[in-house]
Regions:
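Short alpha-helical segments enriched in small residues
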Residues: 1-166
């Protein structure tokens, strides 16, 4: 797979850093469909860091695999801060990971609305210690591939940031 150089570099940095610190990472992906864990496992030595990756495209998968509350999805929708946070927490709970990152968004070309346009992505990273970061990105209607790659970049940045939070 040919990843953009900056994504490859971010993934390598995380694998090196987590390896040195004996940390494990898991992912939960909706709009990226496994691209985040794909970029990370492209790096040699990633098997000592990556515990698992959930691809929870449907609401049912978010509920069954990650324990996202049906009420959260009903009240806030799949693409929301609340859902991203529950996805990240559920990933930590349902894995052996020290840190988890979760993404949910609208990659387009359809599925957008005035309140939730194409290019809206919610990302959350959680630590087993209770640390949490959320980021709302509005990438705009850049096209499906560009939105998905931009989400991978932001997710990797969020993981690196949380893993080094004071």
């Amino acid at each position: 797979v040919m990843w953009p150089a900056d994504i490859e570099q971010k993934a390598r940095h995380i694998i090196r850093d987590f390896t040195a610190r004996g940390l494990k990472l898991a992912t939960a992906e909706s709009c990226t469909g496994g691209l985040i864990v794909g970029a990370l496992t492209e790096v040699a030595g990633s098997s000592s860091v990556i515990d698992r990756g959930f691809v929870t495209y449907s609401n049912e998968a978010k509920i069954e695999m990650l324990g996202v509350a049906g009420e959260t999805l009903a009240a806030h929708g799949a693409v929301s801060r609340e859902t991203a946070v529950e996805m990240a927490l559920g990933t930590v709970t349902n894995s052996a990971a020290d840190f988890a990152v979760a993404v949910t968004g609208i990659a387009g070309p359809s599925g957008g609305s005035a309140e939730k346009p194409v290019g809206l992505v919610h990302l959350a990273a959680a630590g087993r210690d209770g640390a949490m970061r959320h980021r709302e990105m509005r990438y705009g209607d850049l096209g499906r591939e560009a939105i998905r790659l931009a989400t991978v970049r932001t997710a990797l940045d969020l993981v690196a940031e949380l893993a080094h939070a004071p």
